[in-house]
Design a protein with these regions (language model features):
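Sliding clamp-binding short linear motifs
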Residues: 1-145, 170, 223-243
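Single-stranded nucleic-acid-binding OB-fold domains
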Residues: 23-24, 121-237
Length: 244
């Protein structure tokens, strides 16, 4: 508050690496900042005094204050049971965000770096998900041969739906990573209505611009005919800056 930064903006800055010198993982540090923001001025004052004892870990300090019934500088319980229950009601909302973002820590870091800086300096998008799937970058896709299988994660630059002359609907998707672009097409055919199936599974909504998606498909000249699309946006909480 003294710096004139609300907790949402501070949370996004931390997730983007503004306090990277700390050894704590970013999503955990975000939760600590959000928890500290919920404290009263009296609690904050005492927590700062207790900092060296608990290595300035806000969550561990809260745990000790409640379990060990630590007294404040006014010789009263620093955080009584009733006060802790009040604190916990608001804290649990932030804990849910942490539970989500810590599972995909690298993805959360990549997203907020790109959102606030325009690029990610700590990781490549391919490396975020490469442990799950055999991914390619856009350069490798471009260098691949016709009919090669393609597996790629990227950011949607544009996506729109059209209908072919024979009446089948299709979606054109332009996506990119740090190295270049990929043009893909998700089509309905007589054999399989791939676009229709995707829409049915995603509330009749195409991938939005700036969404992060994973595609599987087959290379054909300068385009990839897509077999399946997965939207990765729901893996992390993306609206930290909107928090109050």
């Amino acid at each position: 508050k003294q710096a004139g930064i609300n907790i949402g903006v501070l949370s996004a800055l931390i997730q983007a690496g503004a306090l990277q010198s700390y050894k704590t993982k970013r999503s955990r540090l975000v939760l600590e900042a959000q928890s500290f923001n919920l404290l009263t001025d009296r609690e904050k004052r005492n927590f700062i005094q207790l900092g060296p004892k608990f290595n300035y870990d806000v969550l561990n300090t809260i745990k000790a204050a409640t379990q060990d019934k630590i007294l404040g500088d006014d010789n009263k319980r620093l955080m009584a049971d009733k006060r802790f229950e009040t604190f916990k009601k608001k804290y649990l909302k932030y804990k849910e965000i942490w539970e989500k973002n810590r599972v995909y820590e690298d993805f959360a870091n990549w997203f907020f770096e790109k959102k606030l800086l325009g690029y990610s300096y700590s990781t490549k998008l391919k490396s975020v998900f490469s442990k799950e799937k055999p991914l390619m970058n856009s350069y490798e896709v471009e260098a691949s041969e016709n009919n090669d299988r393609i597996y790629m994660v990227g950011v949607v630059n544009d996506c729109f739906k059209r209908r072919s002359r024979n009446g089948n609907q299709y979606a054109k998707i332009e996506m990119s990573d740090e190295l270049g672009f990929l043009h893909g097409m998700l089509m309905d055919t007589q054999r399989q209505p791939k676009l229709t199936e995707f829409l049915q599974q995603n509330n009749n909504t195409l991938p939005k611009k700036e969404s992060v998606i994973y595609i599987e498909g087959r290379k054909s000249d300068d385009i990839v005919f897509i077999d399946s699309v997965s939207v990765y946006d729901d893996k992390i909480y993306m609206k930290l800056s909107d928090l109050k």
